[in-house]
Each structure stands twice: as structure tokens, then as C-alpha cells.
Amino acid sequence: MSASTVSITANTAAATRRTPILAGEKKSNFDYPQSESLANGGVGEAGGTSRDLSRGEATLDRSQGQDLGPVTRRSVSAATGTNTTATQRRTRKVATPKSEKARWKTVVRIFAKQLGALLIIVGLIQLTRKMILKASSPSSPISSYETEMAFSGLESRIAEVDGLVKATTNSMQVQVELLDKKMEREAKVLRQEIERKASAFQSELKKIESRTESLEKSVDEVNAKPWVTKDELERIYEELKKGNVDDSAFSEISIDELRAYARDIMEKEIEKHAADGLGRVDYALASGGAFVMEHSDPYLVGKGSSWFATTMRRAHTNAVKMLSPSFGEPGQCFPLKGSEGYVQIRLRGPIIPEAFTLEHVAKSVAYDRSSAPKDCRVSGSLQGPESSAETENMQLLTEFTYDLDRSNAQTFNILESSSSGLIDTVRLDFTSNHGSDSHTCIYRFRVHGRAPDPVPVVGTNLDQDSSPESE
């Protein structure tokens, strides 16, 4: 719908609104006859005609009027000066029914108003639509300006938000850096404190370890070299009891006699330790009947490096040095190749094992002690008369580490968990030494224990059963 249509419609509505005004013009209910009009000089007719011509109205049909009877009008003539009496017939116009005319006019008026309002609303909607289309069109200068203004406002807000975010980020970064520096300082102080306490703790621990090692050495030396055993004390006590001396006689013993007795005991102990160094029975002594069954590869250098020296027992002839006293002389040992190896020994007889002693050259006379074994393991079994080298039935007896800071002859007791019975074969395994890659030397290996108690033979009834048959 165009603008011209809207304007034309509006004019039509205005004309429609003016229609009731023209139709509702009030006219006189009295109609004068023609003679009266002529008597009045034709003024009324002329006036009526003039009115009808100016307003474009049609003359009303007077035949519809109602005759109300004659009406007498008096008029004075100015020319003659006489009174003229004219009889005029008065008629009343029959009125149309107002209710019907008002109803259809009201309906038309309401319809026209509604139609006009509808047309106006439609026109406004069309105009608004065109304005929106023009605003959304990119070619419109007004819409582009508004868009630029909107974008500029949006960019300014985005810039403000960006600046706020950057400021917040910078402040947070500063706070984080300060916190990191503070934590780093505290961590550094804490680390220094921990290191200081750790160093102090390590120093104290080293002191405790040194004291423990010295105490262990003292205990081992005391255990390894007992001057007077319990059996000897009991024997001395028995000898004193056999002397048949009473308290008075004992009180009369002189100091010289006590010194002589003590000297006698000391000489016996010295002789005993000079003979073997420990004062304990060695069941792996070669001169007592023990021998080496087999061993790992020997380390032989020089003329005697041939394997022809190996006997039928798969042991070298010089392996007997491991079961013989070396008397502390350097070089009186049997070297085995590498840092790992083993030696299997047949004892002089079945025993109940108690301890084992591994001996190396003394520190005071040694040239190099790096060939001494370090981590060792001892196992044993009872094989009987058959001399076999099987290790399947071997039972672990003890594990130990040979320490170069202790005495050259170190004794190790069997494990408490190993409830071993009789054994006649012992195997020594070493898995490392104290630094030598070429060989490991064993000066002497001893086995301590006690022989089993002899079982008394109890008489049976075999002789009694066989006596009647002999008869």
C-alpha cells in the first residue's frame, strides 16, 4: 500500500464524516403556498434557490407535507399604504422514522471508523517495515552511521574490559611472583636447616657407628681369644677341691704360691694358643684327616700352572694349604680365579657344627689384602662314606662378611634358624672380595663343633633266641 492510497483513504473518511452534517440539516416544517411567495416579492424562492444552488442540494418534495388548514397573513404594502390580507394554507411535513435512519447511519459510521483505523494501522505497519528495511540496508547512510556508532561503543567497552583484564593479570602476576619469591626464600632457609641438621645427624651417626664397630671388635676379640673357658674354671675348681685344704690352710697360702699357680695357667694358655691360635678344635684340619673335595678354577701363575697337578678328586695338590696352618706367613694360601668361587671340604668325621673361622694374612705383615674374600656363605650336609660332590642336599649354616679392620682370623657362629644335625661335608661360597679382579686368596678355613655322643649298644634277646638252636 502506497502513501497516495493512504491519503485518498483519509480524504474519503473525512467526506464520510461530513455526510451526516449535510443530511441532518434542519428545515422548516411549514410550507408556504406559491401565491404567498409571489406576494413577498419572490424573495423566499430566490433565497431558497440561491441556497440550493450554493450547497448543491435538491428541492424537497412538498407533496409529502400535511395540510394543516388555511393560515391568514396580513401584509402592509408600502406603495399603496393598504393592508393586504392573504390567506395561506399551513401544512406540516411528515417526519421520517428517526430510529431507522439513526441505526443504519450508526452502523455505517462505526464501520467507516473501524475501516479507517484498520487502514491507518496497516499504513503505520507498512511505514515501520520500510523504515526497518532502510535501517538494515548497508547502502543507507543512516544505518551505517548508527552501526559505526554501535561498533565504536562496543569497541570502547571491549577495550575497557581488556584493560581491566590486563590490569588484573598484572596484579595477579605480581602477587604470584612475590609469593614465589617468598616460598623460595622459605624453602631455601628450610633446606639449609635440613642440611645442617642432616650433617649433624650424619656426624653423630658416624660417631655411633665407630663406637659400635670398636665395641664389636672388642667383643669379637674377647670371643675369639678366650683366656680361661668355663671348662677350665671348673677344672681349676675341681683341683682346688681335691687339694683337701680347709679355709685356714687356704688363708695361709702365700702370694708367691698364687703367682706360681697363675704363671702355670698362663703358660698352658700360651702353649695352647701358640699351637693353633684359637684354642678350639678344627675338624677341617688336613693333618686330622680332612681334605678338599673340589673347588672352583684355581689361579696359578708360573711353572705350576698346569692342570696336571689336579688329582682324581678334582682338587689341586696345593689346595691342602686352605686346611693347614699358615703361621701368618704371606703367600701361604690357595688362590682361586676371579672374585667368585667355592671350596667343598670333607671333614674328618661327622660333627655337630657350631662355628666357622676364615683366616687371612695379618694386616701388619701383608703386602696387599685386596684378595681377601668378602661376602661368604657356608652350607653343609651329611653324605656318609660315599664321597660325592653333590650340593642338592646342602643346608645353609651361616652367612657372613669378612672385615679387614678386624683380626685376621674371624669366627662366625651358625645361624640360630638352622637346626642342623650331623654333617661331614662343608661348602664355602664367596661372591665377592675386597677389590681384586684377578684372584681371591684363602689362607685357612676351619670348622668348629663337637663330636656326637657315642650311642651305647644295648643287649637284645637275639643271643637268647639263638641259644636253643645251637643246642
Swiss-Prot record:
Q: Quote the protein name from its UniProt record.
A: SUN domain-containing protein 1
Its UniProt domain note says: The SUN domain may play a role in nuclear anchoring and/or migration. The SUN domain is required for interactions with WIP proteins.
Q: What GO cellular component term, any one, is given?
A: endoplasmic reticulum membrane
Instruction: Name where it's found.
Output: Nucleus inner membrane; Cytoplasm, Cytoskeleton, Phragmoplast; Endoplasmic reticulum membrane; Nucleus envelope
Low complexity bias located where?
Answer: 78-88
Q: In which tissues is it expressed?
A: Expressed in roots, hypocotyls, cotyledons and leaves and inflorescences.
Give the membrane topology.
Single-pass type II membrane protein
Q: How does it assemble?
A: Forms homomers (e.g. dimers, trimers and tetramers) and heteromers with SUN2. Interacts with SUN3, SUN4 and TIK. Core component of the LINC complex which is composed of inner nuclear membrane SUN domain-containing proteins coupled to outer nuclear membrane WIP and WIT proteins. The LINC complex also involves nucleoskeletal proteins CRWN/LINC and possibly KAKU4 and the cytoskeletal myosin KAKU1. Interacts with LINC1, WIP1, WIP2 and WIP3 at the nuclear envelope (NE). Interacts with SINE1, SINE2, SINE3 and SINE4. Interacts with NEAP1, NEA2 and NEAP3.
Stored PROSITE patterns: SUN
Q: Spell out where the chain crosses the membrane.
A: 106-128
Per the UniProt topology annotation, the Perinuclear space ranges are 129-471
A GO molecular function annotation here is: protein-membrane adaptor activity
Please give the residue ranges for the topological domain Nuclear. 2-105
Q: Which positions bear N-acetylserine?
A: 2
Write out the residue ranges of the motif Nuclear localization signal.
88-95
Location of the region described as Disordered in the Swiss-Prot/TrEMBL record: 19-98
Instruction: Give GO terms for biological process.
Output: meiotic attachment of telomere to nuclear envelope; nucleus organization; protein heterooligomerization; protein homooligomerization; protein localization to nuclear envelope; regulation of establishment or maintenance of cell polarity regulating cell shape
Role description: Component of SUN-protein-containing multivariate complexes also called LINC complexes which link the nucleoskeleton and cytoskeleton by providing versatile outer nuclear membrane attachment sites for cytoskeletal filaments. Required for the maintenance and/or formation of polarized nuclear shape in root hairs. Modulates the anchoring and mobility of WIP proteins and RANGAP1 in the nuclear envelope (NE). In association with SUN2, may be involved in telomere attachment to nuclear envelope in the prophase of meiosis.
- Give the disruption phenotype, in one or two sentences: No visible phenotype. When associated with SUN2 disruption, abnormal nuclear shape, rounded instead of elongated, in some cells (e.g. mature root hairs) but also numerous meiotic defects namely a delay in the progression of meiosis, absence of full synapsis and a reduction in the mean cell chiasma frequency.
